[in-house]
């Protein structure tokens, strides 16, 4: 399979996240994630089924907003916000992926509760250009 351009990979990742996290369409999302998906997150059970089950069990209001996608060959990183996750605060996430055969094959993440304006020592929001309400 020919390697995607960085722009194609970015579009692929954004479509994958929208399909799974915003539309909650696990059946359609299966075309983005490898059957042999390797999960390194401490918050998600193994395999793509662990990820899909997590999303299906999450509140209906779960949403993903993307801020940045970086691509280097078969490695990619996304910076975004998961809101409506059933927690008091949205999670700001850095998700790292390894792609194989054009699919999401391996995943690592770093998650942090989004800080309010009162909590931010820098005085700047963690995501976007304004603090959460």
Regions found by a protein language model. Give the residues of each.
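C-terminal and inter-domain tail/linker signature
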Residues: 1-133
């Amino acid at each position: 399979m020919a390697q995607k351009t960085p722009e194609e990979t970015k579009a692929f990742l954004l479509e994958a996240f929208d399909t799974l996290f915003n539309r909650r369409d696990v059946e359609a999302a299966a075309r983005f994630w490898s059957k042999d998906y390797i999960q390194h997150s401490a918050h998600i059970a193994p395999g793509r089924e662990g990820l899909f089950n997590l999303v299906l069990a999450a509140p209906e209001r779960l949403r993903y907003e993307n801020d940045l996608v970086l691509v280097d060959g078969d490695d990619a990183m996304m910076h975004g916000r998961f809101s409506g996750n059933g927690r008091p605060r949205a999670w700001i996430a850095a998700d790292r992926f390894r792609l194989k055969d054009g699919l999401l094959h391996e995943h690592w993440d770093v998650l942090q509760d989004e800080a309010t304006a009162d909590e931010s020592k820098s005085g700047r929001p963690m995501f976007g250009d304004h603090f959460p309400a």
